[in-house]
Protein backbone atom coordinates (compact mmCIF):
# COMPACT_ATOMS: atom_id res chain seq x y z
CA UNK A 1 0.00 0.00 0.00
CA UNK A 2 1.71 3.21 -1.09
CA UNK A 3 1.07 6.91 -1.07
CA UNK A 4 2.89 9.85 -2.66
CA UNK A 5 3.99 13.08 -0.98
CA UNK A 6 1.22 15.40 -2.18
CA UNK A 7 -1.98 15.46 -0.15
CA UNK A 8 -5.06 14.97 -2.39
CA UNK A 9 -8.62 15.82 -1.43
CA UNK A 10 -10.12 13.92 1.49
CA UNK A 11 -13.18 12.97 -0.57
CA UNK A 12 -13.19 11.81 -4.18
CA UNK A 13 -16.25 11.30 -6.36
CA UNK A 14 -16.84 7.98 -8.11
CA UNK A 15 -19.89 8.27 -10.35
CA UNK A 16 -22.76 9.07 -8.02
CA UNK A 17 -20.87 7.87 -4.94
CA UNK A 18 -17.77 9.07 -3.18
CA UNK A 19 -14.48 7.52 -2.22
CA UNK A 20 -13.42 8.79 1.18
CA UNK A 21 -9.78 9.11 2.16
CA UNK A 22 -10.93 10.39 5.57
CA UNK A 23 -13.79 8.35 7.01
CA UNK A 24 -14.53 10.53 10.04
CA UNK A 25 -12.99 12.78 12.68
CA UNK A 26 -12.44 12.11 16.37
CA UNK A 27 -12.08 15.36 18.33
CA UNK A 28 -10.83 17.07 15.23
CA UNK A 29 -8.36 14.31 14.36
CA UNK A 30 -8.94 12.88 10.86
CA UNK A 31 -9.20 9.10 10.70
CA UNK A 32 -8.04 7.89 7.30
CA UNK A 33 -9.78 5.10 5.43
CA UNK A 34 -6.71 2.88 5.18
CA UNK A 35 -5.65 2.88 8.86
CA UNK A 36 -9.29 2.57 9.94
CA UNK A 37 -9.95 -0.44 7.71
CA UNK A 38 -6.59 -1.96 8.66
CA UNK A 39 -7.60 -1.70 12.32
CA UNK A 40 -10.96 -3.33 11.61
CA UNK A 41 -9.15 -6.08 9.72
CA UNK A 42 -6.77 -6.73 12.62
CA UNK A 43 -9.64 -6.90 15.11
CA UNK A 44 -11.64 -9.28 12.91
CA UNK A 45 -8.53 -11.35 12.23
CA UNK A 46 -7.89 -11.62 15.95
CA UNK A 47 -11.36 -13.02 16.60
CA UNK A 48 -11.04 -15.40 13.66
CA UNK A 49 -7.90 -16.83 15.28
CA UNK A 50 -9.80 -17.11 18.57
CA UNK A 51 -12.53 -19.05 16.76
CA UNK A 52 -10.34 -21.50 14.80
CA UNK A 53 -7.75 -22.15 17.52
CA UNK A 54 -9.48 -25.24 19.03
CA UNK A 55 -9.83 -26.81 15.58
CA UNK A 56 -6.05 -26.57 15.25
CA UNK A 57 -5.37 -28.05 18.67
CA UNK A 58 -4.57 -24.74 20.38
CA UNK A 59 -5.92 -23.16 23.53
CA UNK A 60 -7.96 -20.10 22.60
CA UNK A 61 -6.37 -17.73 25.12
CA UNK A 62 -2.79 -18.76 24.33
CA UNK A 63 -3.37 -18.38 20.59
CA UNK A 64 -5.05 -15.01 21.10
CA UNK A 65 -2.23 -13.70 23.30
CA UNK A 66 0.40 -14.82 20.78
CA UNK A 67 -1.52 -13.11 18.00
CA UNK A 68 -1.70 -9.84 19.92
CA UNK A 69 2.02 -9.93 20.72
CA UNK A 70 3.01 -10.64 17.12
CA UNK A 71 0.82 -7.84 15.76
CA UNK A 72 3.52 -5.36 16.86
CA UNK A 73 6.46 -6.81 14.86
CA UNK A 74 4.13 -7.53 11.95
CA UNK A 75 3.00 -3.90 11.67
CA UNK A 76 6.51 -2.55 12.24
CA UNK A 77 8.01 -4.99 9.74
CA UNK A 78 5.42 -4.15 7.10
CA UNK A 79 6.25 -0.46 7.42
CA UNK A 80 10.04 -0.95 7.53
CA UNK A 81 10.04 -3.13 4.41
CA UNK A 82 8.03 -0.51 2.53
CA UNK A 83 10.27 2.36 3.66
CA UNK A 84 13.45 0.51 2.69
CA UNK A 85 11.99 -0.32 -0.70
CA UNK A 86 11.16 3.37 -1.20
CA UNK A 87 14.20 4.80 0.59
CA UNK A 88 14.95 7.17 -2.29
CA UNK A 89 11.76 9.01 -1.30
CA UNK A 90 11.85 8.74 2.50
CA UNK A 91 15.50 9.69 3.00
CA UNK A 92 14.59 13.27 2.07
CA UNK A 93 11.88 13.48 4.75
CA UNK A 94 12.54 11.14 7.67
CA UNK A 95 9.52 12.44 9.57
CA UNK A 96 7.26 10.66 7.06
CA UNK A 97 8.56 7.23 8.02
CA UNK A 98 6.15 6.78 10.95
CA UNK A 99 3.48 9.26 9.89
CA UNK A 100 0.16 7.52 10.60
CA UNK A 101 -1.83 9.75 8.26
CA UNK A 102 -0.36 8.18 5.12
CA UNK A 103 -0.13 4.65 3.88
CA UNK A 104 2.83 2.51 3.04
CA UNK A 105 2.92 -1.06 4.35
CA UNK A 106 4.04 -4.30 2.74
CA UNK A 107 2.77 -7.71 3.78
CA UNK A 108 6.17 -9.19 2.95
CA UNK A 109 7.93 -7.40 5.79
CA UNK A 110 5.16 -7.98 8.30
CA UNK A 111 5.11 -11.73 7.76
CA UNK A 112 8.90 -12.09 7.76
CA UNK A 113 9.33 -10.11 11.00
CA UNK A 114 6.51 -11.95 12.77
CA UNK A 115 7.78 -15.34 11.59
CA UNK A 116 11.30 -14.61 12.77
CA UNK A 117 10.17 -13.60 16.26
CA UNK A 118 7.38 -16.14 16.67
CA UNK A 119 9.42 -19.14 17.95
CA UNK A 120 10.23 -17.33 21.20
CA UNK A 121 6.63 -16.23 21.72
CA UNK A 122 5.13 -19.59 20.80
CA UNK A 123 7.55 -21.56 22.97
CA UNK A 124 6.70 -19.38 25.97
CA UNK A 125 2.98 -20.00 25.44
CA UNK A 126 3.31 -23.71 24.64
CA UNK A 127 2.00 -23.40 21.08
CA UNK A 128 3.02 -25.46 18.08
CA UNK A 129 4.66 -23.49 15.28
CA UNK A 130 2.77 -25.14 12.39
CA UNK A 131 -0.61 -25.04 14.12
CA UNK A 132 -0.24 -21.38 15.07
CA UNK A 133 0.73 -20.27 11.58
CA UNK A 134 -2.14 -22.23 10.10
CA UNK A 135 -4.38 -20.16 12.35
CA UNK A 136 -2.47 -16.96 11.58
CA UNK A 137 -3.20 -17.59 7.91
CA UNK A 138 -6.88 -16.94 8.62
CA UNK A 139 -5.94 -13.80 10.56
CA UNK A 140 -3.78 -12.43 7.73
CA UNK A 141 -6.25 -13.15 4.95
CA UNK A 142 -9.12 -11.63 6.93
CA UNK A 143 -7.06 -8.53 7.58
CA UNK A 144 -6.04 -8.36 3.94
CA UNK A 145 -9.66 -8.25 2.78
CA UNK A 146 -10.42 -5.19 4.91
CA UNK A 147 -7.08 -3.53 4.12
CA UNK A 148 -7.73 -3.75 0.38
CA UNK A 149 -11.06 -1.97 0.87
CA UNK A 150 -9.08 0.73 2.66
CA UNK A 151 -6.64 0.88 -0.26
CA UNK A 152 -9.50 1.31 -2.69
CA UNK A 153 -11.02 4.18 -0.69
CA UNK A 154 -7.62 5.79 -0.25
CA UNK A 155 -6.58 5.41 -3.89
CA UNK A 156 -3.31 3.70 -3.03
CA UNK A 157 -2.00 0.48 -4.60
CA UNK A 158 -3.77 1.65 -7.75
CA UNK A 159 -3.62 -0.14 -11.05
CA UNK A 160 -2.11 1.26 -14.21
CA UNK A 161 -4.14 2.58 -17.10
CA UNK A 162 -6.25 -0.05 -18.84
CA UNK A 163 -7.56 -0.03 -22.40
CA UNK A 164 -9.02 -3.51 -22.06
CA UNK A 165 -12.36 -4.76 -20.80
CA UNK A 166 -10.84 -5.38 -17.37
CA UNK A 167 -10.94 -1.88 -15.97
CA UNK A 168 -12.83 0.62 -13.83
CA UNK A 169 -12.64 4.37 -13.62
CA UNK A 170 -10.66 4.85 -10.41
CA UNK A 171 -8.31 7.41 -8.84
CA UNK A 172 -4.71 6.93 -7.83
CA UNK A 173 -3.27 8.24 -4.57
CA UNK A 174 -2.89 11.75 -6.04
CA UNK A 175 -6.55 11.92 -7.08
CA UNK A 176 -5.96 11.43 -10.81
CA UNK A 177 -8.90 9.58 -12.35
CA UNK A 178 -8.73 7.27 -15.34
CA UNK A 179 -9.74 3.80 -16.43
CA UNK A 180 -7.47 1.43 -14.51
CA UNK A 181 -6.99 -2.22 -13.70
CA UNK A 182 -8.86 -2.67 -10.38
CA UNK A 183 -5.80 -4.05 -8.60
CA UNK A 184 -7.21 -3.57 -5.10
CA UNK A 185 -10.33 -5.56 -5.98
CA UNK A 186 -8.26 -8.28 -7.64
CA UNK A 187 -6.17 -8.67 -4.49
CA UNK A 188 -9.31 -8.69 -2.38
CA UNK A 189 -10.73 -11.45 -4.58
CA UNK A 190 -7.48 -13.41 -4.25
CA UNK A 191 -7.69 -13.12 -0.46
CA UNK A 192 -11.29 -14.37 -0.49
CA UNK A 193 -10.32 -17.36 -2.65
CA UNK A 194 -7.34 -18.20 -0.43
CA UNK A 195 -9.46 -17.82 2.70
CA UNK A 196 -12.08 -20.16 1.26
CA UNK A 197 -9.38 -22.67 0.35
CA UNK A 198 -7.93 -22.45 3.85
CA UNK A 199 -11.36 -23.13 5.34
CA UNK A 200 -11.72 -26.17 3.10
CA UNK A 201 -8.31 -27.52 4.18
CA UNK A 202 -9.25 -27.01 7.82
CA UNK A 203 -12.56 -28.83 7.29
CA UNK A 204 -10.89 -31.90 5.76
CA UNK A 205 -8.25 -32.07 8.48
CA UNK A 206 -5.19 -31.22 6.40
CA UNK A 207 -1.79 -31.86 8.05
CA UNK A 208 -0.53 -29.04 10.26
CA UNK A 209 1.37 -26.48 8.26
CA UNK A 210 -0.47 -27.27 5.02
CA UNK A 211 -2.87 -24.34 5.32
CA UNK A 212 -0.02 -21.86 5.77
CA UNK A 213 2.07 -23.40 2.98
CA UNK A 214 -0.78 -23.49 0.45
CA UNK A 215 -1.83 -19.92 1.25
CA UNK A 216 1.77 -18.71 0.97
CA UNK A 217 2.24 -20.28 -2.45
CA UNK A 218 -1.18 -19.06 -3.56
CA UNK A 219 -0.45 -15.51 -2.44
CA UNK A 220 2.90 -15.51 -4.23
CA UNK A 221 1.20 -16.71 -7.41
CA UNK A 222 -1.47 -14.04 -7.12
CA UNK A 223 1.15 -11.33 -6.67
CA UNK A 224 3.06 -12.53 -9.73
CA UNK A 225 -0.12 -12.23 -11.78
CA UNK A 226 -1.37 -8.93 -10.31
CA UNK A 227 1.83 -6.91 -9.84
CA UNK A 228 2.35 -6.20 -13.57
CA UNK A 229 -1.05 -4.45 -13.52
CA UNK A 230 -0.02 -1.97 -10.81
CA UNK A 231 0.84 1.67 -11.32
CA UNK A 232 4.67 1.75 -11.34
CA UNK A 233 5.84 3.47 -8.12
CA UNK A 234 8.32 6.33 -8.47
CA UNK A 235 11.98 5.50 -7.98
CA UNK A 236 11.38 2.17 -6.33
CA UNK A 237 14.57 0.62 -4.98
CA UNK A 238 14.05 -2.97 -6.07
CA UNK A 239 12.01 -4.71 -8.73
CA UNK A 240 8.79 -6.36 -7.61
CA UNK A 241 9.96 -9.79 -8.69
CA UNK A 242 13.14 -9.32 -6.67
CA UNK A 243 11.09 -8.26 -3.64
CA UNK A 244 8.81 -11.29 -4.03
CA UNK A 245 11.81 -13.63 -4.33
CA UNK A 246 13.37 -12.11 -1.21
CA UNK A 247 10.07 -12.48 0.63
CA UNK A 248 9.74 -16.17 -0.27
CA UNK A 249 13.36 -16.87 0.66
CA UNK A 250 13.07 -15.10 4.02
CA UNK A 251 9.72 -16.71 4.78
CA UNK A 252 10.98 -20.20 3.97
CA UNK A 253 14.11 -19.72 6.08
CA UNK A 254 12.15 -18.27 9.00
CA UNK A 255 9.63 -21.12 8.82
CA UNK A 256 12.33 -23.80 8.84
CA UNK A 257 14.16 -22.15 11.73
CA UNK A 258 10.91 -21.70 13.65
CA UNK A 259 9.88 -25.31 13.11
CA UNK A 260 13.28 -26.60 14.27
CA UNK A 261 13.45 -24.17 17.19
CA UNK A 262 10.12 -25.30 18.61
CA UNK A 263 10.65 -28.92 17.66
CA UNK A 264 7.15 -29.14 16.21
Tell what function each PLM region has.
Residues 3-264:
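Hydrophobic, membrane-interfacing alpha helices
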Amino acid sequence: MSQRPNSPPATLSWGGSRMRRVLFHVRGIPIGSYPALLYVGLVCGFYVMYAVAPSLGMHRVSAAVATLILFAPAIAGARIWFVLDHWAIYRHDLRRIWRHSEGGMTLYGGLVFALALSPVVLAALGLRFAAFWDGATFTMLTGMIFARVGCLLNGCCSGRRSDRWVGLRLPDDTGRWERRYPVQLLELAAAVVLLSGSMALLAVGAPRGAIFAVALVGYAGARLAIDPLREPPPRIAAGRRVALAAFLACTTLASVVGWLATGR
